Amino acid sequence: KSKYLILVFNNHLYCVIHLGMSGTLHFMGLKKKTTNLSFYGSQSLPKKHNHIIFRFKNFKLIYNDPRRFGFFKILDNKKDYLKFFTRIGPEAISKDFNKIYLSKILKNRTKNIKNLLLDQKLVSGLGNIYVNEILYQAKVNPFKKSHLIELNEIKRIVKYSKIILNKAINFGGSSIRDFKGITGKSGNFQSEFKVYDREEKRCSRYNCSGLIRRKIISN
């Protein structure tokens, strides 16, 4: 759900996992020295930054995270599990994220549209890369105040959120630095970027010869 992984155990415990920016999960046989059973291929298990190990009957699950932005949260009942996700907005790829919902959350908010879309309490599953790409395709200024966004702009934001996220999934994600998908392969959506990481390059929009400039919206 959103950017979280959920493990449900037979004893009614729930484990909510967020991999942060650099976390990976490795599956290994109990007597194996390499991660041949890992989603990340037949590479050796990293020697550093292995923070959590779950031992099961026939294998172990290892959480590795060099930057340590991720977390594991154990919840001991369904009520707490459901409560955890009430603090998270609908996924941008879902039917619940539509023009009616977006219009409602934009109303009376003075935060700029980019920061609003990054707020996981309002919309979940969007990060910096995809918000940049969505607003570019929707032709919406990222600095524009949320309450000033017009209906036709709202429709385009919803439309391109779904188009871009689905396309990114089909391309295996965006491999920036060390990101890999569950097959162990790097994603390819970075080859489709229109604005992210394209500073000083030509705009790819038809009939536009401008250069892409980088501007900081917030720290």
Task: Label each residue range with its predicted role.
Residues 15-125, 130-137, 145:
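Phosphate/anion-contacting hairpin/loop surfaces
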Residues 10-13:
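Active-site beta-strand-loop-beta-strand hairpin of nuclease catalytic cores
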Residues 6-8, 55:
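Short, well-ordered beta-strand micro-motif
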Residues 25-28, 33, 101-218:
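Basic, nucleic-acid-binding surfaces and adjacent catalytic neighborhoods in DNA/RNA-processing proteins
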